[in-house]
Structures are given as structure tokens and as C-alpha cells.
Design a protein with these regions (language model features):
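Glycine-rich phosphate-binding loop of actin/hexokinase-like ATP-binding domains
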Residues: 128-200, 282-285, 290-295, 301-304
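ATP-binding/phosphotransfer module of carbohydrate and carboxylate kinases, centering on a glycine-rich
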Residues: 2-57, 68, 185-330
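Short beta-strand-loop/turn "lid" adjacent to the catalytic site in phosphate-handling enzymes
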Residues: 60-110, 115-128, 145, 279-283
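Short, glycine/charged-enriched secondary-structure capping and boundary segments
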Residues: 28-29, 87-90, 124-126, 159-162, ...
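Short glycine-aspartate micro-motif
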Residues: 12-16, 71-73, 109, 143-147, ...
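ATP-dependent carbohydrate kinase catalytic cores
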Residues: 107-138, 230-251
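Active-site nucleophile and cofactor-binding loops and adjacent substrate-binding regions
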Residues: 42, 87-90, 109-116, 135-138, ...
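Short, acidic Gly/Pro/Ser/Thr-rich loop/turn segments
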Residues: 22, 79-81, 151-155, 211, ...
Length: 330
């Protein structure tokens, strides 16, 4: 929690609500940078109503104005345009009536969580990212974010004729998965038997790491005893063969998918990897075929060679992007 002595009388609220964490911050009027208020684990709350009640209780404990925020922007891991927001990778759901009941007078905007990440990209500094491989980020060119975390998010930022950033959202994590190597084809066969249709999110998220690991165990005839992505990632860092192969495939598939996005969007401004997995296992990412697969685009390999790939290390680009989005509407 922030020190209540630094909280202004009038303020705006931003939230970044994913499948694992719900983060909230305040933004003083006229500012575009958020100041952290609270972070909650989604698993600790049975529904969104409960976390909002907890947030309001924490506000009161900090001496925040009872009237609530002037304006609110929530970035959610769900399609934001529906009347009822149902989170893709958690049981939470809510509608505007619930928000209005909790937030009272606040003007409320809801955006996709990865639209918020994309909006933050132009504001990131060199200290907010780590580059993987060569390539550059051309000013004023399209930038794309892909984020394996609890799920897989994708969004792009382009610029209008006045050089203002425009975010193009979507559900790019749910496009069809296309294997490259023979082993990836074998993994796909097992995932198809389990899920039917296989999107890239079936591989490029925390649960996807487990899916890959279990499929490889079945193919290799080895016991796949680890049950969490954290355990698999840690085991890979300690040279467990099956876990290491799973993480290597995870980052190779991420490289292929990121390269496809670069071709699709013309992302000469760079491709940015968000979410919690890449920063946590950046040592494995650097040793993997991520960049090689990003470049392996046949006749268009040279096109991708010039495009930089970056891991976002900023603590919460979603909150930053939500604050910037809100600032454009003040």
C-alpha cells in the first residue's frame, strides 16, 4: 500500500486485472504516471465484487475520499466491449452496474489488458526493457506486444497523421497454432487429442508450459512429475532434461509467433514480450532459439532481421498504459 500522506484529494483510478493478479493505482489530475495502491491475488477472491469491496475498504483505511475517483480506467484480461465482462482465465465476471455501485460517481472506461500494454510501449525507456538479439526500434513505426502469462495477449500500437499513438487490440492469443519442427508436430497431435482446436495460447502461457512438458514426457516415455510452470522453469534452470526441453520449445514457439506478428503488423518499432514468464526465465530465453525462430521466415528473413525484440521489465506496463489512456480522455 502507498503512504496515505501522498494521496491527493482528487484523483483517478486505474486497474490492471489479469488471471493471476489485480493491481490498482491512482493518478492525480493532469498526471499520466500511476502511483501504486494495491495488488491482490485473483485466487484469494471468489468474485470481482469481493475484490472491489476489499479495495474500497483499503481506500477508507488510507483516508481516501469517500466520493471515490473522478475517472476510472480498468484494463481487463477479457473482451472489454461486452455488457458482462467474463475473464478468460479466471472465474471472475462483472458488469457496469457492479462497478457503478462500488465507484459511485466515477466515469468508467474499460479496455483490454493488452491494449493497455501496447499503449505503454511508446512511453517505455531503455531501463524498462532488455533487448534479445539484434535489430532496432524505429521511431514512429508500428510496435507490437505479445505476452505469455496466465493467458496470451497481443496488441499493436500505430500512429496517426499527428503522431498520436493508436492502439489496435484483439484476441491474437487465440489464433491457430502452427508447428515448425517434427517434435512440435508430435506435441500438436497430443494437444489436439486433448483440446480439439489448438491455439497458440495452449502453448504460450503458464498452463502452456505444463502442456508442452506433459506432451514431451508422453513422447519421450518419461515421467512428467512436475505440475506447475514455476517448478518446470526452475527445473529447467537446473538442467532437468525434460523441463529444459519444454522451456526451450516454449521460447522457440514464442519466437515463431512473435516473428509472425512482426510480418503481419510491419512492426519496425519493435516486438515487445510482456507478461511474467519471459522476465523470470530470461536466461533460458537468451539460450533458446527464440531469435532464430523469429528470423526464420524464408524469403522474408531479412525483413525481420531489422526488427528489434525486447523483454519488458517494467513492473506494470498495464497500469502505465491505462493511465496514459485515461489521460487522453481528461
Amino acid at each position: 500500500m502507498s503512504d496515505s500522506t501522498h494521496i491527493p484529494t482528487h484523483y483517478h483510478l486505474v486497474g490492471d486485472i489479469g488471471g493471476t493478479n489485480a493491481r490498482f493505482a491512482f493518478v492525480p489530475p493532469g498526471a499520466h504516471r500511476p502511483t501504486a495502491l494495491a495488488k491482490y491475488l485473483v485466487a484469494d477472491f471468489s468474485c470481482f465484487d469481493d475484490v472491489m469491496a476489499r479495495l474500497l475498504a483499503d481506500w477508507r483505511e488510507l483516508g481516501l475520499p469517500e466520493a471515490g475517483p473522478d475517472k476510472t480506467c480498468l484494463a481487463v484480461a477479457a473482451p472489454p466491449h461486452l455488457d458482462t465482462i467474463s475473464f478468460t482465465n479466471s472465474p471472475w465476471r462483472f458488469d457496469r452496474a457492479l462497478l457503478e455501485r462500488h465507484l459511485q460517481r466515477s466515469s468508467i472506461t474499460i479496455i483490454n489488458d493488452f491494449a493497455a500494454v501496447a499503449r505503454a510501449l511508446p512511453a517505455l525507456t531503455d531501463s524498462d526493457v532488455e533487448q534479445i538479439g539484434a535489430g532496432t526500434s524505429s521511431a514512429g513505426a508500428p510496435m507490437v506486444a505479445i505476452g505469455p502469462g496466465t493467458g496470451t495477449g497481443v496488441a499493436t500500437v500505430v500512429y496517426d497523421s499527428n503522431e498520436n499513438p493508436l492502439v489496435i487490440g484483439g484476441e491474437g492469443g487465440h489464433v491457430d497454432y502452427a508447428p515448425i519442427s517434427d517434435m512440435e508436430f508430435d506435441v500438436l497431435k497430443r494437444l489436439r487429442a486433448r483440446f480439439g482446436r489448438v491455439s497458440i495460447e495452449r502453448l504460450l502461457c503458464g498452463a502452456g508450459i505444463v502442456n508442452i512438458y506433459q506432451a514431451l514426457g508422453d513422447i519421450r516415455g518419461l515421467p512428467a512429475e512436475l505440475i506447475s510452470p514455476e517448478d518446470i522453469g526452475t527445473a529447467a534452470q537446473h538442467d532437468n532434461p525434460l523441463a529444459a526441453e519444454a522451456m526451450a520449445m516454449f521460447f522457440a514457439v514464442l519466437g515463431s509467433s512473435a516473428g509472425n506478428l512482426a510480418l503481419t503488423t510491419g512492426a519496425m518499432g519493435g516486438v515487445f514480450i510482456a507478461g511474467g514468464i519471459a522476465p523470470r526465465y530470461i536466461d533460458l530465453l537468451r539460450r533458446s532459439d527464440f531469435r532464430a525462430r523469429f528470423l526464420a521466415k524464408g524469403r522474408f528473413a531479412d525483413y525481420n532481421t531489422n526488427i528489434g525484440t525486447f523483454v519488458i521489465t517494467h513492473e506494470d506496463p498495464g497500469l502505465l498504459g491505462a493511465a496514459l489512456h485515461l489521460g487522453e480522455r481528461l
